């Protein structure tokens, strides 16, 4: 048992010291802000929307009040909604800057979101904007968001500038699970490494991505990733081959989509967890074993172990609680939640297993009534 405790502790020492400082939450859009450019490039926001009637007015409304000095317009693609999303959007006062398209039927080989985005980017291309702002229909933006995005992109000559929208943490389930969702994402894709052109690590956050249009065309467009469930990270990887990218935390972009209970969060995570493992049962087995060692062994040894096993388990538990503190602080949560990380890790392990089971049953990648992982898993 002391060997297991020592392994868990060694893993957390590695994560704290050698994993790009992911846990420090230093990469944020309100730090090291870029100077404003002398010329403001043209931008078109592309918003895919499917059954978003409850939030579409707020999300699109936040785009229409952007304090952006350059040419800026919005293209919303109504992806066969059945709840009046398109009708509500058409009723907004867009002052001639909002165009609402009715999406075509989903062709084979495409995920729904990427197909809707592809139609929007094709329409936007008619105006030859320098940037495409890919954002979701359930995200609201502060008025200065686009101005800050463009300033950073122009200063760094970035091909993708992406913000990790702040998710809601109002319900008990959200408080327990949502900060850890971002923590785990940052662990998988350390933002410092994503932002380092010398490293191959690449990712993006789909809720807010400012993309240089010519670079996207050179990369093969959205068609190059048309069947990918984890569309944002695959877009980040595609675009990093074209130039530098940047990803950071923000309070300027916030999710309008609450998660009322554990079931909704489980569905959100399960949609893409098995895709993250390339639909491999062997990677799933290894991941489950790894999660047991990294998250569960420490508290078990700390409580029930003896001698060295207990002390290494306790040290590993303290290390993971320490690592969680900056993200808890960013989300305004008590430091005590850090000691719940083993429980949270166990729940996410269950969500990952659920994701695999859903894929095997033909319901993988479920999004807005569509099982999108079937072809990808074959």
Q: Where in this protein do the model-derived segments appear?
A:
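Short beta-strand-to-loop acidic/aromatic patch adjacent to the donor-nucleotide binding site
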Residues: 129-140
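Membrane-embedded multi-pass helical conduit in multi-pass membrane proteins
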Residues: 283-362
């Amino acid at each position: 048992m002391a060997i297991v405790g020592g392994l868990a502790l060694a893993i957390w020492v590695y994560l704290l010291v050698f994993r790009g400082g992911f846990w420090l939450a230093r990469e944020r859009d309100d730090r090291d802000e870029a100077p404003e450019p002398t010329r403001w490039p043209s931008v078109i926001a592309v918003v895919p929307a499917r059954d978003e009637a409850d939030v579409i007015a707020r999300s699109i409304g936040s785009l229409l009040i952007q304090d952006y000095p350059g040419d800026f317009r919005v293209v919303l693609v109504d992806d066969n909604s059945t709840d009046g999303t398109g009708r509500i959007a058409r009723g907004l006062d867009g002052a001639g800057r909002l165009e609402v398209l009715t999406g075509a039927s989903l062709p084979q080989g495409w995920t729904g979101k990427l197909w809707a985005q592809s139609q929007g980017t094709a329409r936007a291309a008619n105006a030859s904007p320098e940037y495409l702002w890919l954002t979701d229909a359930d995200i609201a933006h502060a008025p200065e968001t686009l101005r800050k995005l463009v300033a950073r992109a122009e200063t760094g000559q970035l091909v993708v500038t992406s913000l990790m929208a702040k998710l809601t943490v109002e319900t008990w389930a959200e408080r327990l699970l949502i900060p850890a969702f971002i923590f785990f994402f940052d662990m998988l894709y350390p933002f410092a490494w994503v932002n380092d052109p010398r490293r191959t690590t690449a990712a993006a956050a789909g809720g807010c991505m400012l993309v240089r249009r010519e670079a996207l065309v050179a990369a093969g467009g959205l068609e190059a990733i048309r069947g990918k469930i984890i569309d944002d990270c695959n877009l980040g990887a595609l675009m990093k081959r074209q130039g530098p990218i940047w990803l950071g935390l923000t309070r300027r972009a916030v999710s309008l989509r609450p998660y009322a209970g554990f079931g909704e969060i489980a569905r959100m995570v399960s949609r893409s967890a098995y895709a993250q493992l390339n639909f491999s049962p062997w990677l799933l087995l290894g991941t489950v074993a790894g999660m047991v060692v990294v998250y569960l062994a420490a508290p078990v040894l700390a409580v029930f172990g003896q001698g060295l096993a207990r002390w290494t388990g306790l040290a590993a538990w303290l290390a993971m609680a320490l690592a969680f503190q900056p993200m808890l602080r960013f989300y305004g949560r008590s430091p005590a939640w850090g000691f719940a990380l083993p429980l949270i890790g166990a729940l996410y392990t269950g969500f990952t297993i659920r994701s695999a089971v859903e894929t095997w049953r033909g319901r993988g990648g479920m999004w807005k009534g569509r099982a999108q992982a079937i072809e990808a898993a074959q």
